[in-house]
Amino acid sequence: MPEKGLAAAILIGGRATRMGGAQKSALTIGGVAILDRQLAVLRRVADPIFAVSSIEGPTVDGLDHVRDRFPDHGALGGIYTAIDASPHDRTIVVACDLPFLTVRLLEHLTSIDADLVIPRSERGYEPLVAVYSRRCAEPIRRRLERGALEAQALPRAWMEPNASEGVTMAEIGPEVLRAYDPDGLLFVNVNTPHDYARANKLVERGSKPSRDRIMDELGS
């Protein structure tokens, strides 16, 4: 059952020039569209689910569509829009190019009481698989207005002493993440044709437990 008082936003992004203009959420991984994979997971933890996009174009079937309030400001503008447009105090924000999200991880993130709950993988903070409260909106808006656009810099800044801007933050480090990501797939994204081919190969070559876990998330 979705958690009460929790929404989810999928950031559709811009023109996907590195993918030749293809709509990344419509790409298929293992024969299933990335968007369908994400919806199968998000519907089990959040309601409603809506899309945020910075460009005019086709809307995502069945989802409310919100126009990015800070176009050309990168992912941080989409994060702000998602928080500001959400009907609930807490919102899961995910990028549209992450095909391997899991219910278990999102349930863990949403169980933690903080204004920002964010994974920190081996490569750093993952601001596009995180839970934000409405309290994050105003500090993010101020950063956008002064041109501080790097999404990963946000949690780094808030972790500094006396720099939290009144926002509480909890990070989920690599040691904890391993329990939710034994096959190392969670934060694989699809930004380029190379990424797309790699993601499909990961599914094709994955172990049987990995394939079973992915299909279980889809309710198969």
Where are these regions (language model features)?
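SAM-dependent methyltransferases
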Residues: M1-A7, P193-S220
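Nucleotide and nucleotide-moiety/phosphate-recognizing core
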Residues: P2-A151, R156-L186, K201-E204
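Conserved active-site beta-strand element of glycosyltransferases/polysaccharide synthases
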Residues: N189
